[in-house]
Amino acid sequence: VSQALGVLTRIYAAELRYTMKRNGLRTVVVLALTIFLLNAPVCATASRLQDTCAEARDEVALRPEWMRILHDTLPICKISIPGSHDSGSIKGGHMLKTQATDIPAQLRQGIRAFDIRLEKKGNKLGVFHSHAFQDIYWEDDVLPAFIHFLQTYPSETLIVSLKKEGGELRDYASLLSVSLSSPEYQSYFVMDFRPELTLKDCRGKILFLHRDHAMNNYPGAACVGWEDDSTCLLTLRNKDGKEGVALLEDEYQYESGEEAGKKVGVCVRNIEGMSAEPVSSRRWGITFVSATGLPLGTPKVFADKVNKPIADYLKQKNSRNCGIVFIDFVSEPGGKDLVEYLIDSNVCAK
């Protein structure tokens, strides 16, 4: 009976989430009461269902405007910014899936840095992870979602890394330059990068980090010297030649999930290096918590072994000024812990 109730509970929980989006309060209340009646007598006696009840209550915290309380004068490079690695990759199977929630949900959760991988599909740029098309387009879905969010929450700023995932560079550049040159979007872009950019400079706007050349008059910064599968110093270059430097950690390829401890170590070292920068420093920090060790060390395997230990370490050390941190499965328990810590650490930002 307990097992059957557990299955039924999960079905009702899924229906509740769907109903909250589609129907009115009355239906939601009915479903909620039903779930409560199903779980109340069982949670007290069955530890397995007790865990299920706890998980049902453990919803993702919504932080749609957490930057609002931060001072305008705070340099962007001194903010701990949670990001999602391969932000649009919710399809493609265990080997390619890196997120469990879509980009609008990530925005509401408090994610402020996005890793967008694009490839020409038809006459538009589709979002891909390797060969897996994610059934969304940059022009139709992703960029409009960013703009709409900033219109709703103008206190926020977004950092968007753009990368050509496949196809020809000329196709990528041609299509991307059209959207980035659109007059209707110009006021939502940070047009010129400076290492000393403040939150006031960027509120209500997107700061682009270009990993591939798209256009000469690009908004944001070009990433120069991004070494594959390594930790290095990265140059962030404005179109007029003005430069900044970032501590970059992007070591993603491992033999298997058994090497997750190594990944934790390199991430912590990069974040702590950024955190230890002098108050006057305008050096940026970019850390990718994501990794794979295929075939068995999938992104989810690594996320489960890496996200929480890093969050726990940062909490223990009370680390601040952590820089931009790209995370797999931001809505899962370990990912949520890391996202929440990074956001909350800004209360005492230098």
Task: Please identify what each model-predicted range represents.
Residues 180-194:
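Acidic, His- and aromatic-enriched active-site or binding-groove loops in soluble protein domains
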Residues 45-111, 122-152, 157, 285-350:
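Long, acidic (Asp/Glu-rich), low-complexity accessory segments flanking structured domains
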Residues 209-350:
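C-terminal active-site rim and adjoining tail of enzyme catalytic domains
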Residues 21-29:
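Bacterial N-terminal signal peptides that target proteins for export
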Residues 156-166:
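Active-site groove signature of glycoside hydrolases
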Residues 1-19:
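Short, Lys/Arg-enriched N-terminal segments with co-localized hydrophobic residues
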Residues 117, 160, 208, 325:
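Conserved, mostly hydrophobic/aromatic
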Residues 29-39:
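Bacterial N-terminal signal peptides
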